Curated annotation (Swiss-Prot):
Its EC number is 6.3.5.-. It is an enzyme of class 6 (ligase). Keywords: ATP-binding, Ligase, Nucleotide-binding, Protein biosynthesis. The gene is gatB. This is Aspartyl/glutamyl-tRNA(Asn/Gln) amidotransferase subunit B.
Length: 480
């Protein structure tokens, strides 16, 4: 029997507000353990939560970006459970009335077709702290993350393959990143994914029993975990067994999913309205004000890059993968940069440098201005493409003016025949054996002089001019 795969994803996104959702503590990542805490985070008796308006702004922005309806009379609920990193023994979340509902985004599949994926809901909540287990036999609780604002985005079960899930996550990450409400860095925990997967016989409308996958710390691991779980469930069903509703974790080493626990239902959390927070009236004016802050989104930019700048769909997709790179490209073109040349540099040397240094484009010295300046120096023959790579590395590490560095470092390309011809004659004098080979008609003997000339000029000879002059002087040499 053949089965259809059914996948839904729950994505937790940390919002990049300065302070936490219900306390004034810093929400920034990477501080010393328990440095970003106060009495609210520790749940001291008598303390009350105070709503951070910026979190609601971010929630509205996310809902609009994901084509969602907005609950304009919004409230919070208590989700009750006990765990050491949750000192209140409940989490403030949203249950029956999330800030956003009935949304959708489009994904692009490998064959170029597009598919709409519905989004059931997006709700605001506080993050939990973090448990660490020491080698000394003790467990430690770090509450820096406790109360950091989250938005959980829950898709409908519209995906039919691990590849579609990967495409959905890619599109969702781009959209959230463009809104500016989160940096969506999985390596720092600001984007976390849980995947729900079930199988059903083709033609059956009713969903099968699902398993939830956790410990998915990259999009590739989401795909790998789903592929393994797809195979595991199919094997169980074909052997006459039944799938249990359970939570499983993905083991990156073995590539397998491993049982963690039997999955709880929402009734296990005993949700009820949060009594210490009021209802929040989200007015039409409030929504309209946030709507004005929405950016141009990746799909819109991709269409513009193809139609207005003549780039390929592939180039447009690469440039818009991160907002920082796309913004850099747009500014470079706006100040006169050739779109194709800027695109080539961003996808080539710049991307390689960023990967090798593990940095983003905002963290290096390269700017739209000095990149366009450098491309202009190539175009007017001041430097060669080879020399430009050296110039780029300097700009990336140190910033500054491309032209000033080229002059200071003596990298200006030699194009003057009155300078090049004496150098060519000196090359002949320094390589008598090669001259004899050339005069005797030895095959490819002339090509050796190209390397000698470039070496003599330290790579600064203008290749087109130098090759033309070299051919001219070799012809004279042959006649002697």
């Amino acid at each position: 029997m053949n089965f259809e795969t059914v996948i839904g994803l729950e994505v937790h996104v940390e919002l990049n507000t300065n302070s936490k959702i219900f306390s004034p503590s810093s929400a920034h990542f990477g501080q010393e353990q328990n440095a970003n805490t106060n009495v609210i985070d520790w749940s001291f008796p008598g303390v009350l939560p105070v709503m951070n308006k910026g979190v609601i702004d971010a929630g509205i922005k996310a809902a609009l970006a994901l084509n969602m309806d907005i609950h304009q009379n919004m409230h919070f609920d208590r989700k009750n459970y006990f765990y050491p990193d949750n000192p209140k023994a409940y989490q403030i979340s949203q249950f029956d009335e999330p800030i956003g509902y009935n949304g959708w985004i489009e994904i692009e599949l490998e064959d170029g077709t597009r598919k709409k994926i519905r989004i059931e809901r997006a709700h605001l909540e506080e993050d939990a702290g973090k448990n660490t287990h020491g080698t000394d036999g003790y467990s430690y609780v770090d509450l820096n993350r406790q109360g950091v604002p989250l938005i959980e985005i829950v898709s409908e079960a519209d995906m039919r393959s691990p590849e579609e899930a990967y495409a959905y996550l890619t599109a969702l990450k781009e959209i959230i990143q463009y809104t500016g409400i989160s940096d969506v860095k999985m390596e720092e925990g600001s984007m976390r994914v849980d995947a729900n997967i079930s199988l059903r016989p083709y033609g059956q409308e009713e969903f099968g029993t699902k398993a939830e996958l956790k410990n998915l710390n990259s999009f590739n691991n989401v795909r790998k975990g789903l592929i393994h779980e797809e195979k595991r469930q199919a094997q169980v069903l074909r052997s006459g067994g039944q799938i249990q509703q359970e939570t499983r974790r993905f083991d990156e080493t073995t590539g397998e999913t491993i049982l963690m626990r039997v999955k709880e239902g929402s009734s296990d959390y005993r949700y009820f309205p949060e009594p210490d927070l009021p209802l929040f009236d989200i007015s039409d004016e409030w929504i309209d004000q946030v709507r004005l802050e929405l950016p141009e989104f990746p799909q819109e930019r991709r269409a513009k890059y193809v139609s207005s700048f003549g780039l390929s769909s592939y180039d447009a997709s690469q440039l818009t993968a991160t907002k920082a790179t796309s913004d850099f490209f747009e500014k470079a073109v706006a100040i006169g940069g050739d779109a194709k040349q800027v695109s080539n540099w961003l996808q080539g040397e710049v991307a390689q440098f960023l990967n090798s240094e593990s940095k983003s484009i905002e963290e290096i010295g390269l700017t739209p201005e000095n990149l366009v300046e450098m491309i202009g120096l190539i175009a007017d023959g001041t430097i060669s493409s080879k020399i430009a790579k050296k110039v780029f590395v300097h700009l990336a590490k140190n910033g500054g003016s491309a032209e000033e560095f080229v002059k200071k470092a003596g990298l200006v390309q030699i194009s003057d025949p009155e300078v090049l011809i004496p150098i060519i004659h000196q090359v002949f004098a320094d390589n008598e054996a090669a001259v004899i080979d050339f005069k005797s008609g030895k095959r490819n003997a002339d090509k050796a002089f190209t390397g000698y000339l470039m070496k003599a000029t330290k790579g600064q000879a203008n290749p087109q001019v130098a090759l033309k002059l070299l051919a001219q002087e070799l012809a004279k040499l042959k006649e002697e």
